[in-house]
Every structure is written in C-alpha cells, then in structure tokens.
Amino acid sequence: MKAGTKILCCALAALLAACGCQPTVDFTPASAPEIHDGDIVVLDMNRWREITSRDSVGVVRLWETMHLAATLQGIVNRDEPRLYIKYVVANGINVDDFWWDKCVGDGKWLDGRNVVTMYDPVKVLDAFHDKIQGLVVYDPAIASTSNVASTVAGADNLVAVRYDPRPGSIYTRLTARDYPVKVWLVNEDGSSKFHTKLEPYRWAVDNYLKTGKCSGETAAYYIDQYWMTAPGNAGMNHHQLTNHDYFVSHKGFFFDLSPWDDEPASDAPTEGNGDRAMFQSIFSEIYKLNGGTRFCHVGGFAPWAHKYSNNSRVTYKSKHEAAQTEWETVKLLSAYNAYKDADAASLGAMANASFWQHYPVKPEYPQGWTTVEDLKAKGLILSNGRISSTKKFILFYVGDYDAAAWIYQQMPMLWEDPARGTVPMMWSINPSLARRAPMVMDYLRSTATEADYFAAGDNGAGYLNPGMLEEPRPVSGLPSGVTAWAEHNKPFFKQWGLSVTGFVIDGNGPGMSLEGFKSYATFSPNGIGPQKLPDGRQAMLVDGMPILRCSGASIGDTRIEDAGQKAVSMLSQHPEFPFDWIRTILKSPTWHAGVKEYIEAQSKNYVVLDAPSYFELLRYYLEQQ
C-alpha cells in the first residue's frame, strides 16, 4: 500500500474501529408490517438526522445504513415507484414530506395506492428481496471502493455493503440472513484487495464500462467514504448517499476524482497525480458507449468542502480555489460530451429521484412571448422608432438552478414566498433537471404567475462548456459535438416552452465561435448570455438571436440596501449601453422586490423588465445598430 493511501486509510480505519459497538441510538422497531404487490413503502429515516459529526460510531452507522437504502431504492424503483425515503431537511422544511404532500395521493398521482411506513432498511430489503441478486461488499480501508460498489450495485442488481463483521453492522445482519455476496471489493478475510485509490476504478472500467454493463446515459460524481473523516464539513446529509438511487437505477458509473494534473489528489497526497488521467479514461469509455451522438448526464459536484480545493476545511489542501475546481471539472466533462447536474455543497442532498422519475409530466408547457408592437404599446419603443437614450433596461436573472438537488431543497421556501408575482423574475432553471425532479418542474409551471418567466439555466439542457464542443477540441481531440448538443437541447426546449438560455458559463473552456452561436440560435432563438464574446463586445446578434455578455458576477448581499447599492454600482459600469442584468443566486421574490424598489428609487431611468420584453427590445436595439 502506498504511503498516501495508508495515511488516510489509517485515519479512516481508526474511525471505523468503533463499529463493534451498537449505534448510539437504536432506530430499529421490533417488527415491520407486511407489504403486498403494488404497495408503496415509505422508509422513514428522519431519526438518523440525530447523528452528529462528533458521534464517530453513529457516523459509520449512518453511512452504511444510507448506502444500503439508496442502492436498494435505485433497484426497486427502476421500473415503477415503490420505495420512498424521508430524510432531507432544508430551511427547516422536510422537503421529502413537502413534495410528497404536494404531488402524491388525494386526487393526485398514485391516489389509491396503499402506503406502508417502515423504519429499518434491512427489513425493507427483506420485503423486496426478490428485486435483488445479493450483495457487493466494499473495503472500509480503501475509500474509493464505496463508489465502485454503487456502480456494481446498479449494473448487477446488488445492494452495497461496507465490510464489517462486528455485531450490529449492516454486513453482519445481512450475511446472517443468508444474502449471498456476489462481488467482493475486499478479500473475504477483510484484507484489502486493492491498495491505491485508483486501482478499484481501473478494475471497474475494465469490468463495467468496457463490457457495456454500465450505461453511458448517466454517471455520478459523489464523495466516497472519505466523507466519514470530516462529516461536518458540509452538513450531515452531505454524504449524498441519498442521491445515489437515481444513478443506480440507470446503471451509472460512480467516481470521485480530482480534475487536476498539476498536483496529487487531496485524498491520496503521495500517490502522484493520476486522478485526471483516470477521469479521462472513464469518460473516454462513456463517450464510446454513447457513440458520439448522445450526452452523458453526470450528477454531483467536486466535493470541494472535503477535497480538491484550498477551502479552509480541507485537510490536504489543493492550490486551487473551489470555483476553479468546478470549472476544470466541467471543462473535462465537456470534452467528452458529458454535462453536469450540479448537486453542489452544501445544498446537494436529494432523496427519491428514482421514485420521482416516474412522475407524469405534460408533453408541452408553452410560454408566451412579446412583439415589437407590444413594446411600442408599452412605450419602450418611441414614436421615432428608437429606444430611449437615457434609460437603463434591467433583467433579473434568477439562478443558479443547474442542480436537481437545489430546486428540490430550495423551492419549498423560495417559490412559496408571498411576494412572488409582484416583481418580474426570469427563473433560470436547467430543463434537464426534469429527469430527476419532474414534479418540481411541473409544480412550478402549474402555479406560476404572469411575473414568473422561465429560461434555461447554465448552459441549456445541462451544464457544460459549449466552446469545448467545437473543433479542434481541447483535451480529448474528439470530433465536433456542436450539432449533437443542439439536437440534445431541442426536445427539452420544446417540452418546457423555452427560447432563452440565461447564463452560459464558459469557465476554463474557450468561448464559442460563430459556429457555436449559430447552433444555439436553432434551439434558443430569443437569447443567450455567455461569459465570453469576441472582440470584447457587450452584445451581438447572430441569426436573429440576441446575445448579451454576462460576466458571471452576482449579488449575494442579504440586506436590501447593501444589495441595492451593489446593483447600482454594477449598472453604472457600461453607461453607453442601455441593457444590463442582475444575476442572483437563491434569492427570494421578497428580496428581488426590495432591490427593484431600491434601484428604481435611485433613478427614474432604471427600468426592470420581464424577460420577453427585455430580450425582444434588445433584439430590436441590435437590429437598429
């Protein structure tokens, strides 16, 4: 075993040594109710939130129990919704309860189905034993084997179990029930089968990607069991095991790797810097599975609160900031026709996507647009055919909704704000989030006001760098993905009535050329907002599509006066150009209404517009230049 892995694994092993003890709290009822075909089982895991980061025994029990539940759920829910978990809380709201109450029963979806509540995932496994083939057992000393176990679980219909022969462990309970171990990622005597971080991934690539046992449709970028060394870094639900179910259901490949090749990975500091090469090897194989015409949906995010960044909480610090690690990850994914569904810390926990994937949505959710005649009627185009030379037209870009976990967690608070409908807001929500959270998307559309307009968030139907799709392609050298990206986006934009892509993050990748802009014009004809434009331009028109440069700066101040002052400062940076927008992240309608009132009080020339009026007026302005 190499020294770097040994150092970290010894620390993890010390934590796990306590596992011979019983859990701090016994969460298992004496008996479980019987279930029948068609019943929906609700697995209530709310009491596991009582575990704290200081409870080393409880942390281990939490990990192994959640891992069992998530991999079981992904398999059980693959073909129909049967197993629902209650666990995730955000802003004081149990969001699993919230979406269940909004969308299930009483004249809604699944009305009439019998619901059985259970508390112990082992007994839930007993109830659904016919759905699985056995166990995949992984090594507590080699952290990466936990992610490989989730890969194997989905491909082989197994549940993931951490090796621990002590009394009370999940492993002991299941082997005592005679569940067969079908795949060992640790030797049967508990000694390590693999000895470095990357060895298990090489094995998984050879046995599950190259053989086609995994689907190229999805992949999953979630922290491995290294999480247990510092569980308090990003919230106790940020093991993100609850997120695994969807990707298990879709036979996705799980990984946790650094995107950098200029330093060793934080979790293997003396093993060299091979993570990036392994990252590329994985996605090269996924690209082959997809034939260069389909895109891979990658859930998750670089675990920057634990690894691969210079964040103060990281034990072995990177020299790179968290945002740079995010951008480098997206650059790599983009090079291989993969996009991110960015479940980022510390709002990244989401349960039940494998359940909700079956939620029925409408074929189309149309949205209206505006016309030049409408703009004239509103006085936005003057009688002389020009627009005012003194006005500054402003749009609220409301984001960053590029993660299913974020809309799952945050919309129960933000969307229910009583001020919604009093201020025009361009909700920029990535339409591909409908794969994991279709009920959220449907609920937003069904309850929207005239002031709520929807655009695609970064960067269309998935978060990637579109400039990385153009030949010659950096990193991968693969053929152009520009046309394939447009074809990927078109059905999403049609179904969700979208014609604007708000913020296009170019990140560490190159900006788009004319080819890329023309491609976006085929599915986002009413506007896009990239970070990078040629020749330092602020705006341009391509095939009738208005393009407005967005620097990426956002206003995060909580106090309205502070936010308003910053907004006014930003709006004064380009006095010669009559259009600007204010990008916000996870801000409420009440906040937006307050900022609107503040900036309009500073000058009668500040005019906040709805998205259709804004982009149609921008198009008209650019056509006149």
What are these regions (language model features)?
Residues S354-R445:
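Active-site beta->alpha N-cap acidic-glycine motif
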Residues M1-L8:
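Bacterial N-terminal signal peptides that target proteins for export
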Residues A342-V372, P612-Q625:
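A recurrent domain-boundary module in secreted/ectodomain proteins
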Residues G272-P303, I394, G399-Y408, P412, ...:
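Catalytic grooves of carbohydrate-active enzymes
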Residues N430-L498:
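Substrate-binding cleft of extracellular glycoside hydrolase catalytic domains
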